[in-house]
Design a protein with these regions (language model features):
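Interdomain linker/hinge connecting the two RecA-like lobes of the SF2 helicase core
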Residues: 1-45, 64, 171-190
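Conserved phosphate-coordination/catalytic loops
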Residues: 2, 25-33, 51, 80-87, ...
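Short, solvent-exposed loop/turn segments at secondary-structure junctions
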Residues: 16-20, 53-57, 80-81, 107-109, ...
Length: 222
């Protein structure tokens, strides 16, 4: 069981930023390229990017600086920035007009809000929506006057599909415990899942010799 947990943890880290693993020999990972392209489409907007680990922050910071050398980049992690500095950051970010806030999701305290940010990118998922909402709700406030766009960037057909399904299933259970009997299809619509997520999930299977292997969705590998 411990070996399986270690494999899952490694797969999730590789999904977030494979170039943080010493054995990686490829170019810029596809997910980081996707996020860079999204930033290019939002070149005139302030954008926030929230990941879970500092090493992933560093990977994205390097790629962003290389792609957008003239665009303001603000990097925030829990151990590198004081609360006073984060409050000062709010003013500086707003004045930048098209700055990029790159941070760990847990580094933004509830006392500092960024209601002027309309686009939030989350390329690394938590295990439940309540943890992620603590981050993106820093940008969705009662005094917000514009529509907010929250983007969950994941690899389709990878372990991240399983993680997303778990997040959605937990959200359904959470709503049920609060007296809201919501259909899972409604949860899909709320989160913008417009594809057949169940068909791309990974599952653990056994072959005819009793050996465990991973099956990717409904694909049949021959």
């Amino acid at each position: 069981m411990m070996r399986l947990i270690q494999q899952i943890t490694l797969l999730l880290r590789i999904s977030a930023a494979p170039n943080t693993v010493h054995e990686y020999i490829g170019g810029t990972p596809a997910k980081i390229v996707k996020v860079l392209n999204m930033l290019d489409d939002m070149r005139d907007d302030i954008v926030a990017i929230g990941v879970r680990h500092k090493i992933v922050v560093n990977a994205y910071a390097e790629a962003i600086r290389e792609r957008f050398p003239d665009r303001p980049l603000f990097v925030v992690t829990g151990s590198t920035t004081t609360l006073a500095a984060r409050r000062k950051l709010r003013k500086t970010l707003r004045e930048s007009k098209n700055g990029i806030l790159l941070c760990t999701q847990q580094s933004l305290p509830s006392s500092v809000n960024f209601e002027f940010v309309d686009n939030v990118i989350i390329p690394e998922l938590h295990y439940n929506n309540s943890r992620m909402s603590q981050f993106y709700m820093r940008f969705i406030r009662y005094n917000s006057t514009r529509e907010k766009n929250i983007y969950f960037v994941t690899y389709l057909g990878s372990i991240e599909s399983n993680q997303m399904q778990m997040v959605l299933a937990k959200e359904k259970l959470n709503l049920f415990m609060r007296g809201q009997d919501t259909d899972l299809d409604d949860i899909y619509e709320r989160f913008g899942v417009d594809y057949d997520l169940l068909s791309v999930l990974m599952s653990r299977e056994m072959d005819e010799n009793g050996k465990m292997y991973i099956k990717w969705g409904e694909q049949n590998i021959v």
